[in-house]
Amino acid sequence: MRLYTIGYSKKTAEEFFDILRDNGVTQVVDIRRHNTNQLAGFTKQSDLPWFLDTIAGIGYSHELALAPSEDLMRAYRKEGLPFDEFAKKLRAEFDEREMPKLVDGSALLCSEPDPDTCHRSVAAEYLAEKGDVEVVHL
């Protein structure tokens, strides 16, 4: 199974949807705890499913099981928790949750442009360890 990850920051709507379509993404899995963000208006929870379906024929789901807890996110963003410690604690949170079943061609969505500093890379690696999954960062 191929699992993509994508961050929408620093992308125009055209770039974002073209990348998804050009790579054959079938489902966007939104793993943001708060998906009403205004960093890019086209990614708001109330609009994104419609845009994905209408522009590219791509499905949408919101999976909080793959989002960090509020406390962990605050420790990372506001209190300076190093990313490696954040990743370790996030994996421990994942161990306590039921992971969603993803389809081939799913793309984990978050805001960060760089997967190396985003929880989507931790989530993708975690899921890859649980099965036959190839991770591709878009």
Where are these regions (language model features)?
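Residues lining hydrophobic/aromatic ligand-binding pockets adjacent to catalytic sites
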Residues: 1-138
